[in-house]
Amino acid sequence: MSKHKVYTLYIIVGVTMLLAACTMPAKQQTVGNKARHQFTNEVLLGYTPVKNQGSNPLCWAYSMLATIETEHIMMGDSVNLSVDYVARNMLMEQTRRHFLANGKFRINMRGTMPLLLRLLNEYGAMPYDSYNNRDINYKSLAKRMSTLSDASANMSILEERAERVLDDHIGALPPHVFMLGAEYTPQEFAHSVCMRNEYMAMTSFTHHPFDEMFVLEIPDNYNNDPFYNVPIDVLMNRIEKSIRAGHPVCWEGDITEKGFSFKDGVAMLGKEQPCTQQQRQTAFENRSTTDDHCMALIGLAHDKQGHRFYIAKNSWGIDNPYGGLMYLSENYIRMKTVAVVVKNM
């Protein structure tokens, strides 16, 4: 056994927590709220229109695509990417996996930020305007694909049936991508907007050594993607440095705190004070910090008292005081971050 103890944090109670994660809680679905907090924006990077994931657990895809979109806007480029294209390819991949595993692999639409990067690299990308459908229930579609897999005699029959179902529910795939008068394959287009190894996944926990990669033990990391482990001070510095340099950061973390309010557009801790590395670790191990939701961090701000906040682009629509953006306190980010994906600089 390794001298470094590895604690298995795949949680029995995690199944319960996952039911409420990623999508917007019903208690926060309030329209027309007036701003209760006033902020001064120090940095606000450009961003594409805020989208709405609805009841689909696809925040990891929306947030990572939003991060890539903002990265290109800050370079003077304009790109708006299709979540449906990514979701379709993921569904097809998982349907094959379910079939080959004799039904032992559960098809689901949850994931982590690095999963999006792998799917882009493997299957390509589509512009939002070329492939989008606002009325898809992906959880229901995943169940349909599972049933289809169980009823198929072989892979070729399964793939033919699955493609037909996906065409009917999401739409037929365009054979090519047309951008600025040029024609691309989906793979060529993806590589033009996100190169291999352009981004790095980072985290900060003490059950693994710092300055090493490890497979983060969270339920949605079923692909065993590795994250680079650093002290929390280093992680916070990297987040701020990236944003000030014009690079957005994809954020993955806990939204179960009472102080997280989409309807108010603010996330704060009950006790607004900096946490220690050990406090973060304790919260992760006792499940008071869980992997719930992903957003793109696109700015920095402060309130009247000078308290610092990070501006996040959410994917729950625009019905809050800041048009779908949220202000997360620095202490909230420090305590409740599970992982981030940053631009390799």
Question: Where are the predicted features?
Answer:
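Bacterial N-terminal signal peptides that target proteins for export
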Residues: 1-11
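C-terminal motif of bacterial Sec signal peptides marking the signal peptidase cleavage site
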Residues: 19-21
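Bacterial Sec signal peptide processing site at the extreme N-terminus
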Residues: 23-33
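Active-site signature of cysteine proteases
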Residues: 25, 48, 163-345
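Active-site-adjacent bridging/hinge elements
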Residues: 31-43, 90
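Active-site nucleophilic cysteine motif
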Residues: 54-68, 107-114, 293
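Structural recognition of the beta-strand scaffold that forms the well-ordered cores
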Residues: 58-61, 85-88, 93, 116-119, ...
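Papain-like cysteine protease catalytic cores
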Residues: 80-181
